[in-house]
Swiss-Prot record:
Protein's recorded name: UPF0250 protein SG0794
Origin organism lineage: Bacteria, Pseudomonadati, Pseudomonadota, Gammaproteobacteria, Enterobacterales
Record family assignment: Belongs to the UPF0250 family.
InterPro entries xref list: UPF0250_YbeD-like (IPR007454), YbeD-like_sf (IPR027471)
Recorded coiled-coil stretches: none
Gene Ontology CC, one term: cytosol
Pfam families tied to this protein: DUF493 (PF04359)
């Protein structure tokens, strides 16, 4: 039996997204812009470069209020052109 994400979370709760994208200066700004649309707040994302420096990992934590917000953000973050993966 599959456990669904909304069965594991009790809202509101902190929820961290890890966004991997091409190492371009605008990556962090684009991630924060999308997050602000769905979960307004004051964010200080953590950025880590890949070993070769071609990609950056941006970790950002929101206070999620419902499962639809979590799912929408996964979808919207994945639509950013320079993003390769959202975890």
């Amino acid at each position: 039996m599959k456990t669904k994400l909304n069965e594991l979370l009790e809202f509101p709760c902190p929820f961290t997204y890890k966004v991997m994208g091409i190492a371009q200066p605008e990556l962090v700004d684009q991630v924060v812009e999308v997050v602000q649309r769905h979960a307004p707040g004051d964010y200080s994302p953590q950025v880590k470069p890949s070993s070769k420096g071609n990609y950056h990992s941006v970790s950002i934590t929101i206070t999620a209020t419902h499962i639809e917000q979590v799912e929408t953000l996964y979808e919207e973050l994945g639509k950013i052109d320079i993003v390769r993966m959202v975890l």
